[in-house]
């Protein structure tokens, strides 16, 4: 996608770790003093590492997990634990905040969480306008035409928004 003129931002792995911890606290599996201290140390380390790197690389601030879950809620209940809610909530939140122009969902061939997110992203596109491309990988490179078409549409929409903003 970068070869096609798009700026690509990868979803940070930290969000999955934060989500797993959030779910453990919500279920009541964590909550003691030791858990609170561990959480404080982890958040402090993350902030000290992510903050400076984010400035250099132009990364957006990661969304708090409750905000990510809230963004995904109209499309997927968080009771279905797993990466599907993150695959939906992270790009929806970023789209609503104007941080992205499209989302690419990449997963292994026939991965059920990926299929669920792909199906729901169709509804997100209809209701909110978020352009998305789902790639189910089986070891073969993706079809270049899919990437070309996605990049073309992202650029077209961006140019239209920019023209409307300056008019």
Model regions: which residues?
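An N-terminal assembly and electron-transfer interface module characteristic of large anaerobic redox
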Residues: 1-167
């Amino acid at each position: 996608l970068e070869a096609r003129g798009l700026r690509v931002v990868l979803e940070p792995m930290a969000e999955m770790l934060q989500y797993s911890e959030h779910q453990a606290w919500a279920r009541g599996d964590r909550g003691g003093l030791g858990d609170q201290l561990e959480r404080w140390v982890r958040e402090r380390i993350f902030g000290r590492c992510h903050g400076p790197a984010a400035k250099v690389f132009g990364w957006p601030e990661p969304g708090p997990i409750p905000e990510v879950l809230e963004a995904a809620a109209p499309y997927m209940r968080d009771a279905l634990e797993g990466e599907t809610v993150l695959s939906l909530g992270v790009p929806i939140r970023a789209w609503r905040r104007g941080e992205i122009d499209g989302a690419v969902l990449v997963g292994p061939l026939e991965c059920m969480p990926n299929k669920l997110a792909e199906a729901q992203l169709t509804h997100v596109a209809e209701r909110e306008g978020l352009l998305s491309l789902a790639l189910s990988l089986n070891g073969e490179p993706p079809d270049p035409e899919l990437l070309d078409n996605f990049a073309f549409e992202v650029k077209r929409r961006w140019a239209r928004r920019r023209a409307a903003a300056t008019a």
